[in-house]
Regions:
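Short glycine-/polar-rich loops that comprise or flank the Walker A/P-loop
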Residues: 65, 87-92
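Short, glycine-/Ser/Thr-/acidic-enriched flexible segments
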Residues: 60, 200, 249
Length: 279
């Protein structure tokens, strides 16, 4: 990959406040807007521009953050509306400048479709945006803009569009085997842990685990989503790859008990995640 220069401006001098991001050679502009600072951008010229935006926050999902993806011809007015009628979000990431209404409609459709396919976040959009047809040249501009969206969201720590590695492409496989459970997975660069399809998990949960909150809720959720399906009287099977926030969240779900994922997951040589990654 080639070197990329990214400029970040703090217009209020506050690292926790509004940020404006630009990339060398790119005509677009990104605004990072904490919800409590929304009205501080009212007087900026760009607040009247067309934009695609992402609202991030915590929802009911114990694993994944929630996101709403939208577009608007005048983005500030739309965010004001969301400030009144959407409770979950705490930060808005807005991409504007260098795009028109047709571009942002195209980008909204592409963003929602890809986010749902990757499935790292709880997508709040109720309606699938219609695809907006562009000319060949407009599409090229929009696709270039979308690459910058993916880059900047990644730089900001939002993995919405980060590809999930396939098992055959992973060089470091870790295994966790316990009573009635045998799972394989790998640690991602984000600190998340993916458990691969075909792994098994123990059905029976320990008494102390049941009395907890996050572990049982997580297991109940992935069972309800049919990610974990009953294989026999003792075991579930993962019917697809699943990303957990941490190695321990993954091992807890596999074992039906509290565990330390950094020592539970071992490579083919028997070394733990802790030995390979933290020492």
């Amino acid at each position: 990959m080639s070197t990329i220069g990214i400029n970040i401006l703090l217009p209020e001098g506050d690292p926790n406040g509004i940020k404006i991001i630009e990339i060398s050679g790119w005509k677009g502009k990104t605004f990072v807007i904490p919800r409590g600072k929304l009205k501080n951008i009212k007087e900026r010229e760009e607040s009247n521009y067309p934009a695609i935006y992402f609202l991030f926050g915590d929802g009911d999902d114990p694993i994944r953050q929630k996101v709403y993806i939208g577009e608007s011809e005048v983005f500030y007015n739309r965010l004001l509306n969301h400030n009144d009628n959407k409770d979950f979000w705490n930060i808005a990431i807005v991409f504007t400048s260098g795009v028109n209404r047709a571009h942002v409609k195209y980008l909204e459709n592409k963003s929602v479709a890809l986010a749902k396919k990757i499935n790292r976040y709880d997508i709040s959009n109720q309606v699938e945006p219609l695809e907006n047809r562009l000319s060949e040249f407009e599409r090229a501009d929009a696709e270039n803009f979308f690459e910058k969206i993916k880059l900047i969201l990644g730089v900001l720590g939002f993995t919405l569009f980060q590809d999930i590695p396939q098992r055959q492409d992973v060089s470091e496989i870790y295994r966790f085997k316990t009573n009635n459970a045998d799972a394989s997975g790998t640690l991602l660069d984000t600190g998340e842990f993916i458990v691969f399809k075909g792994s098994t998990a123990r059905i029976k949960e320990t008494e102390s685990f049941v009395k907890g909150i996050s572990g049982p809720n997580l297991r109940a959720k992935i069972i309800a989503e049919s990610v974990l399906q009953r294989q026999n009287v003792d075991s579930f099977v993962f019917v697809k790859d699943y990303i957990f926030r941490s190695p321990s969240a993954a091992s807890d779900a596999v074992a039906g008990r509290s565990s330390n994922g950094w020592t539970a997951w071992r490579d083919l040589a028997g070394k733990t995640l802790d030995e390979n990654k933290r020492r």
